[in-house]
């Protein structure tokens, strides 16, 4: 598991300096979902492509009541200067403003607290840098998803958006999403729901795939 947080743990209510000023994390989240994601260093190629894609997708996350906040071991001043490069990469006006804040963790306090450091990747002083961690928190401030990539492999933010849509759907409805599921695809009825109850819960219908075992656990229904 990435770092010091396990699924179901409450997010630490830390304070930090960011590109939009000082924040307290729980106040920043409010009643929203939240994604806290770390990157190794500013002014590096893979990180620029990642935050560029996150910026492009920010409106899609916002539509779903999801707040983004990034973190690295660089200073606020570096974050702001690098934001110009990131916007230029996106063929946008090279301003210091991204659609989400970036946390200044130059002392590595949060990276240590949250277990975000990559021991295999070090800076010019021989100190470990932050790995590519993703934490998704629900409106209850509890961890719903964690992903850990090494510094050398960029993340897929379209996949992170897909997962968030699944998390929100399955938090509200008694369904699960199958392999390669996309928003709008059929979903799976939880195996703990009796057949008669499933018919009432899912008026659009329930399709059961016949299997050699004779067990009726592969049940699909249109996305509620």
Curated annotation (Swiss-Prot):
Location within or outside the cell: Cytoplasm; Lysosome
Major localization class: cytoplasm
GO biological process: cell redox homeostasis; lipid catabolic process
SUPFAM superfamilies: Thioredoxin-like
PTM sites of type Phosphotyrosine: 89
Enzyme Commission number: 1.11.1.27, 3.1.1.4, 2.3.1.23
Domain Thioredoxin residue range list: 5-169
GO cellular component: cytoplasm; cytosol; lysosome; mitochondrion
Molecular function GO terms recorded: 1-acylglycerophosphocholine O-acyltransferase activity; peroxiredoxin activity; phospholipase A2 activity
Residues found modified as Phosphothreonine: 44, 177
CDD domains cross-referenced by the UniProt entry: PRX_1cys (cd03016)
Sites of N6-succinyllysine modification: 209
Keywords: Acetylation, Antioxidant, Cytoplasm, Hydrolase, Lipid degradation, Lipid metabolism, Lysosome, Multifunctional enzyme, Oxidoreductase, Peroxidase, Phosphoprotein, Redox-active center, Transferase
Modified residue annotations for N6-acetyllysine: 63, 209
Site (Important for phospholipase activity): 32
Assembly, per entry: Homodimer. Interacts with GSTP1; mediates PRDX6 glutathionylation and regeneration. Interacts with APEX1. Interacts with STH. May interact with FAM168B. May interact with HTR2A.
Miscellaneous notes: The active site is a conserved redox-active cysteine residue, the peroxidatic cysteine (C(P)), which makes the nucleophilic attack on the peroxide substrate. The peroxide oxidizes the C(P)-SH to cysteine sulfenic acid (C(P)-SOH), which then reacts with another cysteine residue, the resolving cysteine (C(R)), to form a disulfide bridge. The disulfide is subsequently reduced by an appropriate electron donor to complete the catalytic cycle. In this 1-Cys peroxiredoxin, no C(R) is present and C(P) instead forms a disulfide with a cysteine from another protein or with a small thiol molecule.
Name of the featured protein: Peroxiredoxin-6
Species name: Macaca fascicularis (Crab-eating macaque)
